[in-house]
Amino acid sequence: MGYRKAILLLSMGTTLLFLATPSPAQVDLGDYTVSGAIEAGGMPSHRSGNTSKLEEYRDLPETVVVPQLELFIDSKKKDFYLEFDSLKTGRDDQSYRLRTGRYGLVDVEFVWDQIPHLFNVDNARTPFNRDDGRYTLSSKPAGTTGANVRDWVNANAQPVDLKLYNGLARFNVRYTPTPGWTFSGSYGSQNTTGKRAFGVYIGPSPGSFNISELAEPIDYQTHNIELGGEYAGQGWSLGLKYNASLFHNNVSTLTWDNPLNTTGLGAACVDSAAYNPAAGTGPCRGRLDLYPSNQAHTFILNGAASLPFKTNFIGAFSYGWRLQNDPFLPFTINSAVIQPTISRRSLDGDVRPTMINATLVNNFFRDVGLKASYRYYDFDNRSKRVLLPDGFIVNDQGVTNGTELLSFPYSYAKQNIGLDASYNVARWLTAKLGYGWERMHREYARELLNSNEHSFGPTFDIKPTAWTLFRLSYRRFLRDAHDYDAGRNAAVEIGETPEDVRLSRLEELRKFDQAARQRDRFSFFTQISPLENLTLHGGFDFTNDRYPRTVIGVQKDIDYAPSLGFIYAPLEWLSIFGDYNWERFDWRMQAIARNTGPGGCPDLELRTAENCPAATWRSRGNDEIHTVKLGTEMQVVKNLLNLHFQYGFSFGSSEVRSSGNSAASGDTGLVPATDYPTIVNRWHEFIARLEYILHKNVSLKLGYYFNSYSSKDAGVDLMRLWMGDVETPAAGPNFSNSIGRSIFLGDRGKGSYQAHIGFLGVRLKF
């Protein structure tokens, strides 16, 4: 019915256009000229499957649409202008832009954008009733077995849409009173609302538990303010700018009823300190804090100057404050649990980032280019330390964990130096040599306090002819990691000694961001135009990361991306283009089981890959994406009929192969490592577009769009409201285990679909 109405309105509009006298390209109104364009039409379509992926970030209606609207008013004296344009007017992904001002003096702009984000509107369901951040149940399972939970959730769950709406408004002003002075200001506001999947947990860890997957309420408001001024003199400039970002979370706390406490509903429910899912006791509800409201302020001073000996300087200095002081929630909402002690009621979060950038470029010597750069960034965390002398409550049940903790405000500082020299060896060859140094300093609680990384390598630009270009570059990176010590985390776990902390984290474990690393990076690009109407291009990027001193953790990471493409215009009215890209990522890591038991390696002190090969497992991952694009542009009849065809295809896959952790380790309850099911997705797109120019100001547009998507992901495709028979089929008929007593949204993510969409429209210029 929707597309029939669209076709009827389009036919009426087309008839009126034929009957009307075409307008000139612009309209004179006194001292002003007015020009613009409007496009309107309909989008009949046929869709099948799960369309959440199709409309993930866009709105594709089956009604009349206005894809584009443009208006421009210009003064004949060239002292005033006004521009207005919009895209997809009235849709969920619409945008508007209004700009006006006086040439050379003032420019004012207002922009409005809407961006939808669709997670799932097809199969997510929940038994919870929501009131802002409060999730309540109007009923509970008849018993505490997994079968009771299954029957209850299937009977009481209601559909819920998982999607977000982003509304962004921005107002910009630029004022130039003199050729030297420029002042600017802007204000932006972003509102994000909606719901997305969010998992919560009640029960000890480790131990029995129950999960409830909720539709998390999202209601964020962010304000961004920017003010600045700049003066440009003869050969120099200086500017000062202020930025502010104010974030407010309108729903900062999440509270939910516990389906496994069967003592009653609402106020009739009785809290218990002991969590016993079989008996239906424990906390009546759970509670957690969401993202806190916060603010950031930054001052930026920047400048540039032309110096003697053909030298140019560019520099910037910034200093800021990031502040957050949201009150802490009590440790638990469970009234049967005694609240532990805490030293503060809020964090008083205070981070002072400092940044210095300085660059010198010199071209004094003929055919020689020199460049030196320095960057310093200091993340100075002045937040207060918080003491938990008795530890904390685990998931609203039981007693404190008894581990004395003292928070540590992590800080770091990073310095970078870059030196580059280039030389025009010949008319067709330019060679460049670069060196870089990076020093990272971390606060005491991190495993590695200081690391240095050196990089060096050449770049060559080769242009043997006017129609041929080759660019090759290679860079070698070497990062050290001396004095890696996991025991430094005792600064947080103050009830433990450094030796205790080292044992609990395994001596051989290295975190990849702090581990010694060797990196090789190679890049190649070429562009060849053997004919005036033919251009070929290609490239290859390769990065190889190795972690030579890592036994437990990431050991290797390789990625490479070859690409090919062409543009060919065999005829004046015909052009053909094509591209192929392949990206591949390979990684390897090694891990070791930490559980102890009879046989094998019962002590963490002796638990190494060499001593316990049977308890060690290896994982090898491979991710790759193939993308193909082919198309053509045809001007069949000049200034009358244009055609466009384009086809796109992509194929992506992700594999994880695992081995090891065999029963020979002797550990009780051992689960051998197994391969993860391969994730695969395919995407096809075909576009056909025709433009028939009825008059220089009137054109008819016809289009067809085909889009197909398929995906196979075992971790998502199997999701249902209740997963007990999927996780442990042998636990039936009662399924009285943790997953059997858990509930989910049943959100299967972005399922497969096919869509055929037409477009019938008219574009009118005036």
Residue map of PLM features:
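Bacterial N-terminal signal peptides
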Residues: L9-F18
